[in-house]
Amino acid sequence: MTISQQAFLRDAMRRLNLTRDVFATRIGVKRRALDTWLLPEGSQEFRAMPEVVQRFVSEIVQNGVLLEKYTQSVQDGPLRERIAVEGKNQLLSVDQFTRESVEDLFRVADMMQPIARRQKVSRVLEGAVLGNLFFEASTRTRVSFGSAFCRLGGSVCDTTGFTFSSMAKGESIYDTSRVMSGYVDAMVIRHPDQGSVAEFARATNIPVVNGGDGPGEHPSQALLDLYTILTEFSRLGKLLDGAHIAMVGDLKYGRTVHSLIKLMALYKNVKFSLVSPQGLEMPSYIIEQASRNGNIIEQKTSLAEGLAGADVIYATRVQKERFANEENEGYTPDFQINRAIIDAYCGPDTIVMHPLPRDSRPGANDLSVDLNHDPRLAIFRQTDNGIPIRMAIFAVLLGVEGLVQHSLPFFIIVLLFITKGCITYIHNDTLFDCRQTVMT
């Protein structure tokens, strides 16, 4: 089975680095027609792309090496080998990625979208077990990783908090990692100490994903954030090259911004406005790394200076659990991002993002709830993208991304659960005879 029409077109636009408007002109169609082709299959306004257009797009992508230096061929080896850590299929830092490998992962995520939306079903990880080892509080990340693994047919074992771990009895990270490796096929680890996830990973050969290591990194969050930005920019007719990104809040301890700015630094001529209270600035070593590719870094202490003209505003929660008492003094209500601030300094196509959770209590120095119904607020579209991105991560690290293309339509799987005996159906113009006895 080929990839979906939506994934095919997104891949073409990314490979050619074109906005929707320019891409539509390039292939000789109206923007409105392209928009209907990019909708999820099954939606009311979805339209099938004519075969002649599909052939034309394929020819452009194959022959039009407009940005060949940005495009990674599959002939260069499997993606998991290109992002491997010391020969191991693990995801510990965004430093493992090039721009090409990021976009290759996003192509896999595009393929996962109909499975994430439950329009199709995949069982490629059936029998595999994920160990979610969270030694620090988490809701979204833990559930998102678990859901992603289950969407591919696997099962999940959860461990949360030090008090429920043998590490509370003095067990070492090394011992814990070695023991868990015998129980599960992959691990996602969150730990309050920077560098601890890498220590877990060194003790095992199974895939390990960094779910957040103290103030260090959060690579899967950065990947889903970048995927969201590129998806929103495609809709708005923008490119990340040359964009203005404002990051606001606790930039010292906020691991999501540490990973995201390094990932976006793979693009060119990006302007980063880093807005934070004094004492909570972005670490200097990250600023130095983000300054490559002609990117501009400006550090600000007020929202008015940092938000003006921003294409993306990325707000972060105050990491009070990592503060020394005196560090909290500089964080005032002046750093609350609300609708009045956005209207005053930003345009109608600014994207407002947040890794969540946000402090929604009245007067909190965070992203205000008065933006909840503002179309510029992308935080829930952002969280929705966590499932396909994390599905893509698991598929790549476990080497099953190619098998996902053989996923069955969701309605056929439903029939298997409600019908006994022999089921015959047609899928992609091929006759299948499924012999499976199902309990009712």
Question: What is each model feature region?
Answer:
Residues 1-16, 54:
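A short, Lys/Arg-rich alpha-helix, primarily the initiator
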Residues 23-24:
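Short alpha-helical "recognition helix" segments of helix-turn-helix
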Residues 123-230, 360:
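Phosphate/diphosphate ligand-binding glycine-rich loop within oxidoreductases
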Residues 48-68:
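DNA major-groove recognition helix of helix-turn-helix/homeodomain DNA-binding modules
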Residues 29-48:
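Recognition helix of helix-turn-helix/homeodomain-like DNA-binding domains
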Residues 78-143:
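Positively charged, low-complexity intrinsically disordered leader regions
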Residues 290-369:
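Rossmann-like adenosine-cofactor binding region
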Residues 140-147, 238-315:
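Glycine-rich phosphate/diphosphate-binding loop of Rossmann-like nucleotide-binding domains
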